[in-house]
Amino acid sequence: MSVVGLDVGSQSCYIAVARAGGIETIANEFSDRCTPSVISFGPKNRTIGVAAKNQQITHANNTVSSFKRFHGRAFNDPFIQKEKENLSYDLVPMKNGGVGIKVMYMDEDHLFSVEQITAMLLTKLKETAENNLKKPVTDCVISVPSFFTDAERRSVLDAAQIVGLNCLRLMNDMTAVALNYGIYKQDLPNADEKPRVVVFVDMGHSSFQVSACAFNKGKLKVLGTAFDPFLGGKNFDEKLVEHFCAEFKTKYKLDAKSKIRALLRLHQECEKLKKLMSSNSTDLPLNIECFMNDKDVSAKMNRSQFEELCAELLQKIEVPLHLLMEQTHLKTEEVSAIEIVGGATRIPAVKERIARFFGKDVSTTLNADEAVARGCALQCAILSPAFKVREFSVTDAVPFPISLVWNHDSEETEGVHEVFSRNHAAPFSKVLTFLRRGPFELEAFYSDPQAVPYPEAKIGRFVVQNVSAQKDGEKSKVKVKVRVNTHGIFTISTASMVEKVPTEEEDGSSVEADMECPNQKPAESSDVDKNIQQDNSEAGTQPQVQTDGQQTSQSPPSPELTSEENKIPDADKANEKKVDQPPEAKKPKIKVVNVELPVEANLVWQLGRDLLNMYIETEGKMIMQDKLEKERNDAKNAVEECVYEFRDKLCGPYEKFICEQEHEKFLRLLTETEDWLYEEGEDQAKQAYIDKLEELMKMGTPVKVRFQEAEERPRVLEELGQRLQHYAKIAADFRGKDEKYNHIDESEMKKVEKSVNEVMEWMNNVMNAQAKRSLHQDPVVRTHEISAKVKELNNVCEPVVTQPKPKIESPKLERTPNGPNMDKKEDLEGKSNLGADAPHQNGECHPNEKGSVSMDLD
């Protein structure tokens, strides 16, 4: 089972995997651990990652990048309309009102949703992980910004489903960083001690996030998060682009914004310049050849000028930091360390601002680029049964307060309740109790819309169905469990109606406790149970809110036992004590049964099942097309490689191994094949290239084989000759009565002599015949045949010549009744054969003699 963590960023992606040796960040086919978040569409296939980024300037209209922030947003979203102006590709509205990306693919116009585009990127990451792990990848943990809303998170999960990934958890970036930091720390305070507070700061390509986390041994708790979704390294690049656009317009009379290719080149050069200024404070040049209208442009900038240009952006850094400290009620002296990650934190001015705010140096112990991916892989390993990981619980925080609104039975007034406050622990469940006579609706929304970087405050509308009054006409008690799950998504997980069923108590039967239905999952108990009851014009309509406890993957749920109906009447207790007494007359009893209720969810953003299946099918077809195109290109490259290889070697090492007539014919075929490749063979089916390759190999393989045989033949013949000499010498020694071989039977040795003579005769005949052959003719014998002869000779001779001499048994020792052993004369020979000294008797020990057991002392 694979364990993979995916950091899917706006600009680039990182893949971390868990192995026996720990967590490792893996490289792609270009030996680069960073995979650009870029997809390029061509007439035959898609290009994803590094290869797509290389085509970004030449195929700007069909190359898609910076699409992460489009998840879960409508086309008329103000953010989408603003970003649309800066993109090289077209954004158009989808039928469902979402964002569509229009590109030319397979020589046709195609419209892809953001989920499909992200699925394409995930396909590439999945393929890279599978190539590295050598096994299929299904389970994973994917990172998302902590400020992603419910709709955006659902959109990312849909993208993972399209590509067949089972996302075990959508993990907030900062929580992943905190896990990567804390799980390796051995000096964390104990659970009963004051926790260590660490602030994590992440400035990536497009956003700025901060979080405060409390660490104890074996656990971390996110105290709070703050962010600026529109402040990142991209904004610093844009400041440089704006500056140089104005300079080039004045200096060279060139408007870089009028041509998208020129603007993209300027963006790339400005990003390089920004990185250089992080390590150099001197003036640095910016040179672009043939920028526009065949004109070269040049400019320069230093770090101080850059910081002055970006002063407005640098001031924004402190805003989320102030907000975080206010929300968590922390003081700067309570913060033990400040860990920074993200590519943009390498800018010296950014580091300086953060350090100045906290009054202490920032720490860079984590890998700024890979920390998120490594944290995701650790979380995946914790959730996976295939890995045993040190016990470490993770408690996240809800970034935005969530409220519920509902209509009363009278439909005159509305009830509102905030079920999850800002920075509330997550994952978490709560049980709300309603008194209703019929179905009712609940609407979830974000309580503070101004703090949410998303235009829609509504999360969704949930209809609790099949609710009915009790048989006596009273309102039914409906329990609704609301939950923020491991993905950070709000949902109504279950709803049940408490139904009172009158029954008769049978003789001798024990009284049933009014518990939940056994086939219903028990609710989870909390550390603190609280009941919130507010005054309302209609009695009994305000729900009773029961905190149902935090659910994490590390802590299993425990049964809920707080219901009033669970109390056993005193009369029933008396009956339990009087089991042996004769039964009384039957009396009515009220049995409480929990009935599961269906909940219909109407969410702000969720792909329908039919649409999702269509996207899955489309992605499968594109994957197959990419595979076929790769195989076609591989076949074409094989033909081209074959042409160059044989043409080069026919005038070199292969020249002696082909006759002049065949040489000219083969060269002519190679030239014709090369011309065909660059003309009508430029775009042919895979089979056409396979046929061409077979035609070339039909003429080239015999030449290649003759060359290889000529190279290998002397070596194997020499090996055969050495074995023949070896066995011939042993046979001669045997005939000369050598003591080493006097134990071998003569009939056995005759077999050796016969085999040696036969093989020697065969070798002489072969060598004589081969000497008469020219090099351009096929050899008389192949090297594998000679190797077979060597093996055959060894099989016959080796068992005979390696026969061991029979062992000479040592004579028995004669013992006297009370004296030492008396050895026979032959005992000396026995000792020499055994190679061991006789043991001392009667505990006698002599100095300067070695013991029987040697010990090496360190």
UniProtKB/Swiss-Prot annotation:
PTM description: Phosphorylation on Ser-509 may be important for regulation of the HSPA8/HSC70 chaperone activity.
GO cellular component terms, semicolon-separated: cytoplasm; cytosol; microtubule; nucleoplasm; nucleus; protein-containing complex
Record PROSITE patterns: HSP70_3 (PS01036)
GO biological process: chaperone cofactor-dependent protein refolding; protein folding
Stretch list, region Disordered: 500-585, 801-858
Modified residue annotations for N-acetylserine: S2
Subunit comment: Interacts with HSPA8/HSC70. Interacts with HSPA1A (via NBD) and HSPA1B (via NBD).
Sites bearing N6-acetyllysine, chain numbering: K471
InterPro entries: ATPase_NBD, Heat_shock_70_CS, HSP70_C_sf, HSP70_peptide-bd_sf, Hsp_70_fam, HSPH1_NBD
Record keyword Cytoplasm present: yes
Subcellular location: Cytoplasm
Protein known as: Heat shock protein 105 kDa
Phosphothreonine, modified sites: T562, T816
Skewed-composition ranges (Polar residues): 533-555
Superkingdom of the source species: Eukaryota
Function (record text): Acts as a nucleotide-exchange factor (NEF) for chaperone proteins HSPA1A and HSPA1B, promoting the release of ADP from HSPA1A/B thereby triggering substrate release. Prevents the aggregation of denatured proteins in cells under severe stress, on which the ATP levels decrease markedly. Inhibits HSPA8/HSC70 ATPase and chaperone activities.
Keywords on record: Acetylation, ATP-binding, Cytoplasm, Nucleotide-binding, Phosphoprotein, Stress response
Gene designation per UniProt: Hsph1
